[in-house]
Amino acid sequence: MAKIMAVNAGSSSLKFQLLEMPNETMIAVGLVERVGKDDAIFTIKYGEGQKFTDVLPLATHKEAVELSLEKLMEFGIISSYDEIKGVGHRVLHGKEKYADSVIITEDVMQDIESYTELGPLHIPPNLIGIRAFQAILPNVPQVAVFDTAFHQTMPEENFLYSLPYEYYTEYGIRKYGFHGTSHKYVTERASELLGRPLQDLRLISCHLGSGASIAAVAGGESIDTTMGFTPLEGITMGTRSGSLDPALIPFLMEKTGKTAEDVLNVMNKESGIYGLSGLSSDLRDVQTAAKEGNHRSEMALRIFANRIHGYIGQYAAEMNGVDAIIFTAGVGENSDSIRERVLRGLEFMGVYWDPSLNNGARGEELFINYPHSPVKVIIIPTNEELMIARDTVRVGGLVEQNA
């Protein structure tokens, strides 16, 4: 048995889970919010429903890591730091070099740092989180688990943009895709639930949260995905526009007087469900307003669902069929009305979903198709932390995993 920490460091947050491997038991889950503020919030859940919350000043991620480890000791969750045998870190970008998770060395750190321009909001805190754990647990293997790695199996026809080829060779401009850890987890879990080898399956994974992406997974490998060079491409999201005509950028610069950076900021933070509805990026608020007759909210929901619906058709065509459609992440797992909007009309391709199973289904593994449906429809709550822990064990050679 080995205790593994799975870590996701954001710009002002630190999320972690402590898991016992290889039996994959979650021991504790923690969240530090508002890092860098005088009123940072620390929350930890452990044991049989125990929960502790504190508000205190935390100037740095290193202080947040120190506090997290101290509380694990204080509450008897661990008796010594030596019990932690590995730390896995979610890292946004690994470019083409990293098609799998790796032990973090100084060379790996330099590579990740050089990718900052591809993820200026995410990569700096990823690095800060790694450095903080390295400082406190210097002899513990640290593993980088890249959001982009799973999609490195995409063929050229799906990852290349129709730009001068030199832009790819010189600047690395191509589709990378994201949410790879989530897509990998749910497709592997779908194989188990279907009782069929992953190598024999054609799956469409819909990771629908505030950030959202869809992946076509054939034979266990990602062959296409909606997010691109950055997480801005693809379907409509909470605050992101998704794909649109790139000529809009200079047009909007001229019309509004904004810089290119300003326009990109609008597309990343003021668009999507929020921009369309004018109300909120939270689909629950928008759904409530739509039920009350708010046209823009209803329109935003239609656009969101229609983009997903269209990609399901596209990816089924790319794989010459589909065996199962998976819904995961906050919206995918919990919104029966969004699932209904997405699935409605897909009967032509063998998707026969059961409204009585879909209605009210929230956050649980569940088939929501009729038994005779050629294409299965499955809700699978994602578990990126477990995937990170599995990779940490595998790459670090820490314990024998369950067969």
Curated annotation (Swiss-Prot):
GO terms for biological process: acetate metabolic process; acetyl-CoA biosynthetic process. CDD domains: ASKHA_NBD_AcK_PK (cd24010). Mg(2+). Can also accept Mn(2+). One of its GO terms (molecular function) is ATP binding. Its cofactor is Mg(2+); Mn(2+). It catalyses: acetate + ATP = acetyl phosphate + ADP. The keyword Disulfide bond does not apply. Substrate binds at R90. Mg(2+) binds at N8, E384. Pfam families: Acetate_kinase. Pathway: Metabolic intermediate biosynthesis; acetyl-CoA biosynthesis; acetyl-CoA from acetate: step 1/2. The active site is at D147 (proton donor/acceptor). The record marks H179, R240 as: Transition state stabilizer. Its EC number is 2.7.2.1. GO terms for cellular component: cytoplasm. Coiled coil: none annotated. ATP binds at K15, H207, L208, G209, S210, G211, D282, L283, R284, G330, V331, G332, E333, N334. It is an enzyme of class 2 (transferase). PANTHER family: ACETATE KINASE (PTHR21060), ACETATE KINASE-RELATED (PTHR21060:SF15). Homodimer. Catalyzes the formation of acetyl phosphate from acetate and ATP. Can also catalyze the reverse reaction. Belongs to the acetokinase family. This is Acetate kinase. It comes from Exiguobacterium sibiricum (strain DSM 17290 / CCUG 55495 / CIP 109462 / JCM 13490 / 255-15).
